[in-house]
């Protein structure tokens, strides 16, 4: 007998230069699944706002929506995956999260951010390889052990470079057969994989 699809609320966190509209295709695929979906808008001023501050904002928005204890699933795309992970590890989100899906997120940093000055674009600088934020998150990820963690990445990603390092230090990881960063949230092959991960319980 197949298990029923989960009805836990799902939170979708967008990335740099994106808005919640990014998830429209995914949300259409989820219609009829009887689960609440929340896609908050996190203005980041072109990457100037530190990711910890955005994670704090995310915490407040989730609590406004479902209080402090409702169990959720979380999916973050690109920078949104690092924001989501920061919320999980530093703002207590792991205590209430069943599943975390990181999609094309620079969890180990990205070379494309290396030359960006932190004084001007603090949020972008948080995604440098070896940034203080990523060193902290990767140095102690014990809080993620209670969460089902899944990473999806594009090998040829030019936004998160190298693409194969856009993975969490724990859980499963899958290379998606697409050619670009944005196709991770738009290509049917990628959407199929995401839907499968979201619906299996």
What is the meaning of each model-derived region?
Residues 54, 185-198:
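Post-His helix in hydrolase/transferase enzymes
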Residues 10-14, 21, 31-42, 48-145:
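Serine-dependent carboxylesterase/thioesterase catalytic core
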Residues 13-16, 154:
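Glycine-rich His-Gly loop
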Residues 25-26:
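Short amphipathic alpha-helix
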């Amino acid at each position: 007998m197949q298990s029923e699809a989960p009805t836990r609320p799902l939170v979708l966190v967008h990335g740099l230069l994106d808005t919640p509209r990014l998830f429209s295709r995914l949300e259409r695929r989820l219609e009829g699944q009887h689960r609440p979906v929340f896609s908050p808008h996190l203005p980041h001023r072109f990457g100037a706002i530190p990711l910890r501050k955005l994670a704090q904002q995310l915490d407040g928005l989730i609590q406004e929506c479902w209080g402090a204890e409702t169990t959720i699933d979380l999916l973050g795309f690109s920078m949104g995956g690092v924001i989501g992970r920061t919320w999980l590890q530093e703002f207590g989100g792991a205590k209430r999260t069943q599943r975390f899906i990181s999609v094309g997120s620079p969890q180990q940093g990205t070379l494309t951010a290396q030359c960006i000055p932190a004084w001007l674009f603090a949020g972008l600088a948080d995604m440098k390889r070896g940034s203080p934020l990523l060193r902290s998150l990767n140095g102690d990820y014990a809080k993620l052990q209670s969460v089902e963690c899944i990473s999806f990445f594009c090998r040829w990603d030019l936004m998160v470079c190298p693409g194969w390092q856009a993975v969490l230090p724990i859980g499963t990881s899958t290379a998606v057969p697409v050619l670009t960063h944005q196709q991770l949230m738009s290509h049917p092959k990628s959407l199929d994989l995401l839907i499968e991960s979201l619906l299996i319980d």
